[in-house]
Design a protein with these regions (language model features):
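N-terminal alpha/beta PP-like core and its mobile active-site loop of ThDP/TPP-dependent enzymes
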Residues: 1-208
């Protein structure tokens, strides 16, 4: 999927930019393969990428980070590593951790034909997370990220899952792709905390 124009950027970089705009500041992964354009995008956004020896470790580290900070973080895995991340996905759901699991999935145009590393990750993740969807159009990457972020941070916080086919991940798009598609909030919002605000609690204690 060569880039024919120096001004064009890959779908993975659009994904990284959209997550950066929402406020994500850490990514946990097992680097390589289908996810390379996203990893390059995260590095261009100067976002710390923590490389781990196994996808389950990446998922649990992301879960732990989200529990402490109460801020959404990303766990990025390839299609063959998705199954390894499922236990962490289940654990994050039980602990209400706003982890955004992103799968670099098999090619969209060969879906259902037994393509290379094909797995129905959206269906597998659906009962474990608050939102599970596949990006089907590179022009709508920011829209899918916004939906996932909203689900992860509203009501009871919890994990979400986005599947990004490799052909969209590596394809080239205009830098402003999807920005005029429809209006939506491109900024972050704090995730609800499971404990009182320390400042408010201090005020109460002073009055006791």
């Amino acid at each position: 999927y060569p880039m024919t124009d120096a001004k064009m950027i890959r779908g993975g970089a659009l994904l990284a930019r959209a997550l950066k705009e929402k406020g994500v500041d850490h990514v946990f992964t097992l680097a390589g393969g289908f996810c390379n354009p996203a990893l390059e995008g995260f590095m261009e956004c100067q976002m710390p990428v923590i490389n781990t020896p196994h996808e389950q470790i990446a998922g649990h580290l992301a879960d732990g980070h989200a529990r402490i900070t109460r801020k959404p973080v990303v766990c990025l895995v390839g299609p063959e590593g998705f199954a390894n991340a499922v236990p962490a996905m289940l654990e994050a759901g039980g602990e209400r951790s706003p982890v955004i699991f992103v799968t670099g999935s098999s090619t969209l145009k060969r879906q259902g034909a037994g393509g290379f590393k094909e797995i129905d990750d959206v269906a597998i993740a659906a009962p474990l997370v608050k939102y599970s969807a596949q990006i089907t159009d590179g022009e709508r990457i920011s829209e899918f990220v916004n939906r996932a972020w909203t689900a992860a941070t509203t009501g009871y916080p919890g994990p979400v899952h986005i599947s990004m086919p490799v052909d969209i991940m590596f394809s080239s798009f205009a830098p402003d792709a999807g920005l005029d598609e429809r209006p939506f909030n491109r900024t972050d919002r704090p995730a609800p905390r499971a404990w009182p605000d320390p400042t408010a609690l201090g005020v109460v204690l002073e009055k006791v």
